[in-house]
């Protein structure tokens, strides 16, 4: 589980997931996202979140935690070993507050995969950007999104029932 997403103001520190709201970091369980009608939750600590969402099937003390200290201390062998030893659908929590943290984690993840380990991943866009080697690009312009020579349409998927998503959708619908 790696919900770090710099562009969306999402950070995980000491296993607690935070959302940047203006100049404050708010524990995710205290934000409007936690009250989403489709997938509400109360826990900001990701181990507790796992326990809550699995209705106790997976316990927070059984999760594997990858700390910022391990990542920033470049303890690659130690992290890789943790990943290799994880079994029985064990939940792995990745702390990250910067893309460098995710990049270091991905080195260890790739090492574990090369050692024969398989993973099912739940993450924000940052992990897929790093593992895929996708470069940062500016936001797409209208010219990049719409080709006036074609009558093909487009698809916009809105995936959350929160005020912020509704405001973003409204802004999109009001634009040319």
Regions found by a protein language model. Name each.
Residues 111-176:
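Acidic, glycine-rich loop-and-beta core segments that form the ion-binding/anion-interacting portion
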Residues 1-102:
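Cap/lid and interdomain-hinge subdomains that line or gate substrate/regulatory clefts
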Residues 53, 81-82, 108-111, 171:
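A generic secondary-structure signal
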């Amino acid at each position: 589980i790696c919900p770090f997403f710099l562009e969306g103001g999402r950070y995980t520190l000491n296993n607690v997931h935070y959302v940047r709201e203006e100049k404050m970091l708010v524990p995710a369980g205290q934000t409007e996202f936690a009250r989403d009608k489709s997938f509400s939750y109360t826990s900001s600590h990701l181990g507790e979140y796992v326990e809550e969402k699995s209705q106790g099937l997976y316990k927070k003390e059984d999760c594997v935690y990858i700390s910022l200290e391990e990542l920033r201390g470049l303890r690659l062998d130690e992290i890789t070993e943790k990943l290799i030893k994880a079994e029985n659908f064990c939940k792995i929590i990745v702390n990250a507050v910067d893309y460098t943290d995710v990049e270091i984690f991905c080195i260890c993840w790739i090492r574990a995969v090369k050692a024969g380990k398989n993973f099912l991943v739940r993450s924000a866009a940052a992990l897929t950007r790093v593992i895929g080697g996708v470069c940062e690009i500016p936001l797409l312009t209208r010219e990049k999104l719409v080709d006036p020579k074609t009558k093909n349409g487009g698809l916009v998927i809105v995936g959350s029932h929160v005020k912020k998503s509704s405001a973003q959708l409204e802004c999109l619908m009001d634009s040319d």
